[in-house]
Amino acid sequence: MKIRIDHIAKIEGHGGFVGEIIKGDVVQARFMVNEGARLLEGILRDRHYEETSQIAARICGVCPVVHTLTSIKALEAAMGVEVGSETIFLRQLLMLGQLINSHALHLFFFSLADFFGIKDDLKLIKKYPAYTKDALAIREFGNMLVEKIGGRTIHPLAAEIGGFKKWPSKQILLKIKKEAEKVLPGAIRLGKLFAKLKYPDLQTNFNWASVTAL
């Protein structure tokens, strides 16, 4: 028996599944990435180098920061530009903002309902309103972090080759610190919740191509 699912819900992007069962044994189980061609290389050709980070950011509305910073760092490497510790720190904050936003969305709203056998996310929200508020507050903090450092939440503009177009003030950095302290207890509560979940005993061999290529 062959199984084919062309669209899997609750993932960031588009994916499918192909499986085959013969005499009760699973002989194939394969996840398919169904992302279409982006053709960014062709779009970037012959464009001014200062435009590349904003064009590359359009690869994704959920994770534009990583594409922005990757294109900037690639150009800095090509030009031999070295940045200072302040720039590195702010880029790390910017990247953390995206990760916090994305992970809060994915872990709570995409994954948690399945662990509790709840098919409807609205039922999850009604059953665990306090955890829902924690997840939303954490996600909002991630958005705020990207906005304050990057200039706006989606497709941030501030990062550029060599540094930032506009540097955050001391007041903004202190506000980020204050907001981080506010959401930390909720993050700990959610962490304890996920620590109690029963995870499947799954072991997979990985090639780690992107890591070994560094």
Model features per residue range: what roles?
Residues 1-214:
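Active-site bordering "gate/hinge" segments
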